[in-house]
């Protein structure tokens, strides 16, 4: 089986409490003299205490050119990405030249050559390293990325595969956009990165991380406009439909139950739920749909409060936090990692701790 050898998360360099970000959004998104009570309510309701940003807050008001924004994305993604991969390899006791596959995912910027290509020489990866850059999966890509590592390592069990997620959500900030979707997005999303190192069944490692048993993808018909981007002259304009939690409530239980049943398991057998921190309403919907105890998603809620929603990096930070001392589930028991994203879709990954 695929074994997760290390998970390493990093955050963008500038930390701000929620009130500072709310004030910045009010200055740049609301008309002069506008009533900001709706904005304040949305930002309080996100239950986010602090977030990290790629740039100092006073730089965002001047970012009105998509090219300049994307240049900032590339520079920030390379820096955070290098830190995340180097940290994960160090924790796994492996060197950059051990890496056979590097999967890179982000939905907050674009690059050609891709960020993984820009990192290869800097990190010291082999010239024959296989690379797979992904775009468009959004928040689901952390879970889907682990699933794709597992797919590769089933076919190449002597390989080492790395997933790198970098999301600089603050760089998608849309000035003068007072739409509910944009105001909600400015309340939730933060900047960070994470790297996962995984080893195939025939690759000997001293790592004691969980094994990946299986994964399953679900794409729901006629939901394309629930979540994603509209690409505009000023960059990425968020699409965020308030019906997202309802879709989760309607579909998630059946998807999870069917997946677990195929492996002789039920929800009661799962000792830890590693859920993407999409926001309070999404976490409530997951809890209600699966009839989980109120504290089942405490690690996800704590991550949301401390760093916000990191898009695809979020569930990887939560996996890392779940594996820390005092939180790690009993060895050999099942765990379920799950995330949702544009499509609308979910990705489920069955783990064994």
Regions found by a protein language model. Give the residues of each.
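Short acidic, glycine/serine/threonine-rich loops at helix termini
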Residues: 15-18, 113-117, 144-147, 172-177, ...
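Active-site glycine-rich loop that binds ribose-phosphate moieties when present
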Residues: 134, 141-148, 168-191
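Conserved beta-ketoacyl condensing-enzyme motif
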Residues: 42, 46-125, 131, 136, ...
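Claisen-condensing/thiolase-fold acyl-transfer catalytic domains that form or cleave C-C bonds
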Residues: 107-109, 118-121, 126-128, 133-154, ...
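Condensing-enzyme catalytic core mediating Claisen C-C bond formation in acyl metabolism
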Residues: 1-75, 160, 175-250, 254-258, ...
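Phosphate/pyrophosphate-binding loops at sites that engage ATP/ADP/AMP, CoA/4′-phosphopantetheine
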Residues: 84-99, 205, 254-271, 322-329
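Short coil/turn connectors at secondary-structure junctions
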Residues: 1-2, 96-100, 127-130, 155-161, ...
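Active-site-adjacent elements of ketosynthase-type condensing enzymes
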Residues: 111-118, 163-184, 214-233, 279-288, ...
């Amino acid at each position: 089986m695929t074994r997760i050898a290390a998970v390493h998360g990093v955050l963008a360099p500038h930390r701000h409490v929620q009130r500072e970000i709310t004030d910045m959004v009010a200055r740049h998104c609301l008309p002069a003299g506008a009533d900001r009570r709706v904005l304040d309510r949305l930002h309080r309701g996100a239950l986010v205490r602090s977030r990290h940003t790629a740039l100092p807050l006073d730089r965002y008001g001047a970012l009105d050119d998509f090219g300049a924004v994307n240049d900032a994305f590339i520079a920030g993604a390379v820096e955070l990405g290098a830190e995340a991969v180097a940290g994960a390899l160090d924790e796994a006791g492996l060197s950059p030249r051990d890496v056979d596959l590097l999967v890179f995912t982000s939905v907050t910027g674009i690059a050609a050559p891709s960020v993984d290509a820009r990192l290869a020489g800097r990190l010291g990866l082999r010239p024959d390293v296989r690379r797979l850059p992904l775009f468009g999966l959004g928040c689901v890509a952390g879970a889907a990325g682990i699933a794709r590592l597992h797919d590769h390592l089933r076919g190449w069990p002597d390989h080492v595969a790395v997933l790198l997620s970098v999301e600089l959500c603050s760089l998608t900030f849309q000035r003068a956009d007072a739409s509910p979707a944009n105001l909600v997005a400015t309340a939730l999303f933060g900047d960070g990165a994470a790297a996962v190192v995984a080893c195939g069944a025939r690759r000997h490692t001293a790592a004691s991380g969980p094994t990946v048993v299986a994964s399953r993808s679900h794409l729901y018909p006629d939901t394309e406009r629930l979540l994603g981007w509209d690409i505009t002259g000023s960059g990425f304009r968020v699409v965020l439909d308030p019906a997202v939690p309802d879709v989760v409530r309607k579909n998630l239980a059946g998807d999870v139950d069917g997946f677990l049943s195929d492996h002789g398991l039920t929800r009661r057998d799962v000792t830890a739920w590693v859920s993407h921190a999409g926001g309070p309403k999404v976490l409530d919907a997951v809890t209600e749909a699966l009839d989980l105890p109120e504290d089942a998603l405490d690690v996800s809620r704590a991550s949301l409060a401390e760093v916000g929603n990191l898009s695809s990096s979020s569930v990887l930070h939560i996996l890392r936090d779940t594996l820390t001392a005092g939180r790690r589930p009993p060895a050999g028991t099942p765990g379920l990692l799950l995330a949702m994203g544009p499509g609308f879709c979910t990705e489920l990954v069955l783990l064994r701790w």
